[in-house]
Amino acid sequence: MRPERPRPRGSAPGPMETPPWDPARNDSLPPTLTPAVPPYVKLGLTVVYTVFYALLFVFIYVQLWLVLRYRHKRLSYQSVFLFLCLFWASLRTVLFSFYFKDFVAANSLSPFVFWLLYCFPVCLQFFTLTLMNLYFTQVIFKAKSKYSPELLKYRLPLYLASLFISLVFLLVNLTCAVLVKTGNWERKVIVSVRVAINDTLFVLCAVSLSICLYKISKMSLANIYLESKGSSVCQVTAIGVTVILLYTSRACYNLFILSFSQNKSVHSFDYDWYNVSDQADLKNQLGDAGYVLFGVVLFVWELLPTTLVVYFFRVRNPTKDLTNPGMVPSHGFSPRSYFFDNPRRYDSDDDLAWNIAPQGLQGGFAPDYYDWGQQTNSFLAQAGTLQDSTLDPDKPSLG
């Protein structure tokens, strides 16, 4: 039997041979194609993401129902925070529910629906960050209003400034999304402008919030006020610092990638931070690896800080402290007078130091009904009268 001579290197392959893959040819395919993520992993992650957001949605919905159940003030910092977080959780739940049925259709929605599901939740998170700045700034104002009542006149400008910043953030996102979808503008330029403006506002709000937390930690009256709300400086500082670090790290990452996007050695995620809608539109489909990173980033940079905010503004039973045997009877408040409960709120006599209710104190927090000075002075006056009557039987009693 004659040995088969080797085929020349340039000859055509035989009928049973697989042609070698030539990466220079567009019509050639690699020998094997495997998905970046197995389908069952992607389905499992979709289930986990959807369940987490759905549970948060149910929890916030229960909190809003408790606001009505306990007859708290309906329009308050607490209710607005919870409503924003409820809207955010609902949008994220709907977004991930799309991936159960059609992975491609979730990235090819109509322009408005696409912006609503992908970009608008970040706007809602910025609104919550702005509202946290407004909340803690008012804590400082109310703590200082006893000695500096003129600070209360700055509340209206503070409201207007917060509203203006929120509107700027919303309009920038909406305008850039419309230009990307309908205009002939350079998408990279639009994305860069939006990222630069949005992340700068995020960083500025985070810096402002850190300054507020620092001032609160140095003010004893602010500590008393937070104790009356069922919170404490340590709790406020821990939650605030965590939220600041998460939002700031997200913004700094995006600004870093934006600044060094021309550097080929710098590798970013499979998409531009919260401009996921633009990046997915350019690719027409979010890849498997990009989908995993998308869920992880949303979990760390969105779900975690939102959960902390919801925990801080959760609704508690206002009647729980009324049965506390250590509470002074004359300090009894209406069940509608607060939405933070703290069994230790009157353990210290230092709480009586804030015995003058500043003007306008009832209008800022939910629901505020603090006549600390009147109730304290009334209690002390009655106690003094009873003591005098006991020591001097001939002295007529005023009661």
Curated annotation (Swiss-Prot):
**Residues carrying covalently attached carbohydrate according to the record:** N26, N263, N275
Give Gene Ontology CC terms: lysosomal membrane; membrane; plasma membrane
> Which biological process terms from the Gene Ontology are attached to this UniProt entry?
autophagy; negative regulation of bone resorption; negative regulation of osteoclast differentiation; positive regulation of protein localization to lysosome; positive regulation of TORC1 signaling; regulation of autophagy; regulation of GTPase activity; regulation of macrophage activation
What transmembrane ranges does the database entry give?
47-67, 80-100, 112-132, 160-180, 189-209, 238-258, 293-313
User: How does the UniProt record describe the way this protein sits in the membrane?
Assistant: Multi-pass membrane protein
Family annotation (InterPro entries): GPR137
Protein name as it appears in the record: Integral membrane protein GPR137B
